[in-house]
Amino acid sequence: MAKRGGLCVRIITELASAGELGALMQIENACFPPTERCTPAMMKARLQQFPEWCLTARRGGSIVGFIHGMSIGQPAVQDAFYYIPALHRPGAPWQCVLGLAVAPAFRGKGAAHSLMKAYAAKARKARKQGIVLACRAEKQAFYEHMGFVCAGISQSRYGGGVWLDMVQRF
């Protein structure tokens, strides 16, 4: 449970149901610019390909945030990971975050940190070497606060522009 400002957010580490795709997409659309958004079809494909890696934060039964991603072979993000869910390799040593999103009304209340903490605990339990993600420079400090280290400019150009690869080794 994350609690700040009188708000409790409970982390659910269960698969989001197909009926919750609309709620996930509503948050996705509120959090990312059009060039960086996951499409409904792609979100559905990700949920089908790696449901065990889609964690949700809920309040009163409603989804207020989520984190999802795939298992990969190296600590670097590639554009293909965003487009081809079949690249997920369950036994691979690294866990990649493809999306971390919290509804605007619930930001600053600990939901993102709780989601990442739960995701990391799950990755450790799965004996991963660590977590990797790509972020914009303005989010670097946010992820460093969660224990990530900048590994340099990412080879990913997803949605245009420059990304940084952030790595958290276990």
Feature names for model-found ranges:
Residues 1-8:
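Short, Lys/Arg-enriched N-terminal segments with co-localized hydrophobic residues
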Residues 63-101, 107, 117, 157-162:
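Conserved acyl-donor/pantetheine-binding loop and adjacent beta-alpha core of acyl/acetyltransferases
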Residues 95, 116, 121-136:
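Conserved GNAT acetyl-CoA-binding A-motif
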Residues 89-90, 103-117, 126, 140-141, ...:
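Conserved glycine-rich acetyl-CoA-binding loop
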Residues 9-24:
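A short beta-loop-alpha structural element at the N-terminal edge
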